């Protein structure tokens, strides 16, 4: 009974209407802050791709999915039903919020990255790949990120 109460509260919170533009700016700012903190410049400059934190990586997919849940669950309650990214991506495609092809590409990238990250972790290696790795996935993820958030990007040079 406690689990069902917690789940009901979770869904209620997720389905609260939000200002999409403000949410998008907050998500972008949080992602940039994480990237600066968790992705050392020397790694990027060394020609490596961090599967989790790199541009077009796991965390970018997770942030887009969570943005979609927070932004649109009040209109599409089904988005708040699941907590896993793959089922949420399926819902986004089914409901027409993302193109089906985009959802397939994001899901494939997410599962590919996670599998590689698990293999590296089992070998006690960092979740780093050569810079030329996963180019198709990185392009697809980065393109969707731009499409989703570019309309809400603000020019901070005048602030």
Residue ranges, per PLM feature:
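A nucleotide- and high-energy phosphate-metabolite-utilizing enzyme signature
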Residues: 1-159
């Amino acid at each position: 009974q406690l689990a069902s109460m917690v789940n009901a509260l979770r869904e209620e919170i997720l389905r609260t209407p939000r200002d999409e533009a403000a949410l998008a700016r907050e998500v972008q700012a949080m992602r940039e802050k994480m990237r600066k903190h968790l992705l050392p410049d020397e790694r990027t400059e060394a020609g490596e791709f961090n599967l989790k934190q790199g541009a077009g990586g796991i965390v970018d997919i997770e942030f887009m999915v969570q943005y979609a849940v927070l932004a649109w669950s009040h209109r599409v309650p089904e988005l708040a039903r699941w907590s896993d990214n793959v089922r949420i991506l399926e819902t986004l495609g089914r409901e027409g919020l993302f193109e089906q092809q985009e959802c397939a590409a994001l899901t494939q990238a997410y599962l590919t990255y996670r599998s590689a990250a698990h293999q590296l972790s089992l070998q006690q290696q960092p979740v780093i790949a050569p810079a030329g790795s996963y180019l198709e996935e990185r392009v697809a993820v980065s393109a969707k990120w731009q499409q989703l958030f570019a309309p809400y990007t603000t020019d901070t040079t005048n602030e």
